[in-house]
UniProtKB/Swiss-Prot annotation:
EC id: 4.99.1.9
Transmembrane segments: none
Name of the protein this chain belongs to: Coproporphyrin III ferrochelatase
Catalytic activity: Fe-coproporphyrin III + 2 H(+) = coproporphyrin III + Fe(2+)
NCBIfam families: hemH (TIGR00109)
Binding-site positions, Fe(2+): 191, 270
GO molecular function, a single term: ferrochelatase activity
Alphabetized SUPFAM superfamilies for the sequence: Chelatase
Keyword terms of this UniProt record: Cytoplasm, Heme biosynthesis, Iron, Lyase, Metal-binding, Porphyrin biosynthesis
InterPro entries given in the database record: Ferrochelatase, Ferrochelatase_AS, Ferrochelatase_C, Ferrochelatase_N
Gene3D superfamilies per UniProt: 3.40.50.1400
GO cellular component: cytoplasm
Length: 313
């Protein structure tokens, strides 16, 4: 049997919630050509001259709000899933890598290759494919091996938006919440991307829609909405927007909702601050009454079992 390695990849977090560290993180993130497709000659002056002089202060305050004694949830839960995988797959080398912070993907691959692995399984922790996330991870992994004298067998998981265990997990979590109290509708909120990326061929929204449909097929006849959050910049993004939708629902008689974000494997700034707090306030301030958020896997070992199933260990 080949000596196998698993690399779990997530977005990353600032080193801490200081303005300086948040600025470093944002600069790395917003310099990725997969994330921002504007030509560097145009984009760099905007990034360095405007965005990085304004956004870090605001973002630092938000990161301070979500930071716990264990650090930032995204890193905490990603590390927990690494430990879960090590426990259920003791014969496999497992590590994590972050696209825009430490431990970097390069550092993670150095670690795995030092263990003399022969087969590498790369799992971007994004259920739905997008060039802005999974595509960027692919670039980083391939760029690493372009410079390496040693190549191993590589299995790259493009997406798992329709994996039965993944669909079952969210369906069960939603059902548990529905059994606690009646609701008027379910709101599925996915991270948005620019419409221009979709027109260029990114099929992310198709996979989001398929995920929603597969979950709803298990839930039955319940009203639901699919929305997109976290818009950045002036360009057109996927619609409808989560915040706009939540502001309007109470006027339509929908005052008790369940909100779920299947595009997120672990809680992070976008779910904790945007969905649990900011968007909750929008909904309640506009006449909403009950707002319940369904958490993703976080530290639940079911995600590690899902990964094991995906790579057929």
């Amino acid at each position: 049997m080949k000596r196998t390695g698993i690399l779990l990849v997530n977005l990353g977090t600032p080193k801490d919630s200081s303005k300086t560290e948040v600025r470093k993180y944002l600069k790395t993130f917003l310099s990725d050509r997969r994330v921002i497709k504007i030509h560097p000659i145009i984009w760099k002056p905007i990034l360095n001259g405007i965005i990085l002089n304004i956004r870090p202060k605001k973002s630092a305050k938000l990161y301070q709000k979500i930071c716990t004694e264990n650090g930032f949830p995204l890193l905490e839960y990603t590390e927990k899933q690494m430990e879960n995988l090590k426990n259920i797959c003791p014969e496999v080398e497992v590590t994590i890598g972050m696209s825009y912070s430490e431990p970097s993907i390069e550092t993670a691959l150095d670690t795995l290759l030092s263990k003399e692995i022969e087969e590498l399984n790369v799992i971007p922790m994004y259920p739905q494919y997008s060039g802005t996330t999974v595509g960027s991870v692919f670039d980083s992994v391939m760029n690493y091996f372009i410079k390496s004298d040693r190549i191993v067998d590589i299995k790259f998981i493009r997406s798992f938006y329709n994996n039965p265990q993944y669909i079952d997990y969210f369906s069960k979590k939603i059902n548990e919440a529905l059994n606690e109290s009646p609701i008027d509708a379910i709101v599925f909120s996915y991270h948005g991307i620019p419409m221009s990326y979709v027109k260029d061929g990114d099929n992310y929204p198709k996979e989001c829609t398929k995920t929603t449909k597969l979950i709803m097929d298990k839930l039955g006849d319940i009203r639901y909405y699919q929305t997109y959050q976290s818009k950045f910049g002036p360009s057109e993004w996927l619609k409808p927007a989560t915040d706009d939708t939540l502001k309007k629902l109470p006027s339509k008689g929908i005052k008790n909702i369940l909100i779920v974000a299947p595009g997120f494997v672990v809680d992070c700034l976008e779910t904790i601050e945007e969905l649990e707090h900011e968007n909750r306030n929008y909904f309640l301030e506009n006449g909403g009454e009950v707002y319940k958020y369904v958490h993703p896997f976080n530290g639940d070992i079911e995600f590690a079992k899902l990964v094991k199933d995906i790579i057929s260990l």
